[in-house]
Amino acid sequence: MKKLALMMVAAMITSLTFAQKLQEKDVPASVKTAFQKNFPQAKVEKWEKEGVNFEAEFELNKSEQSVLFDAQGGIIETEIEIEISELPNGIVDYVKTNYKGQSVKEAAKITDTKGTLTYEAEIKGMDLLFDSNGKFIKEIKN
């Protein structure tokens, strides 16, 4: 019985970590207002719910971007797609060495509210996170 309960809790936590697509009408007004205030020249292409947070995907200055908001409209982080060649030295080599047969498909620069910069390298089935110096942090399965 304990095992079943633990499996159910794990399944619930896992389901909360995956993004769920949302209709704009399902996004809190505070979040939509915050988006319009911070990115007045952009139009949301897609809304997603990530756990208790809300992600807006949009294009700005010819680059794919996203911003993650809390339910009150506070920015948690921003993500800007970059060229793979813009990743810090060593990230592409790290992928080749540690994920045999894989290559980086997409790359992004992520900045949190404290100004901390991380890089995301997307490979098949997961995203790999690196610090601003290119040091591996963790992998996130898609």
Where are each of the predicted segments found?
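Acidic (E/D-rich), amphipathic helical modules within compact regulatory domains
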Residues: 36-79
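Mid-chain, structured segments of secreted extracytoplasmic proteins
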Residues: 61, 65-105
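Conserved histidines in hydrophobic membrane contexts and catalytic metal-binding motifs
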Residues: 56-57, 115-126
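A short beta-turn/loop motif at secondary-structure boundaries
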Residues: 48-50, 110-114
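Short, low-complexity, Pro/Ser/Thr/Gly-rich segments in the mature regions of secreted, periplasmic
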Residues: 127, 131-142
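Short, non-transmembrane alpha-helical segments in secretory-pathway proteins
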Residues: 22-44, 85-103
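Bacterial Sec-dependent N-terminal signal peptides
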Residues: 1-22
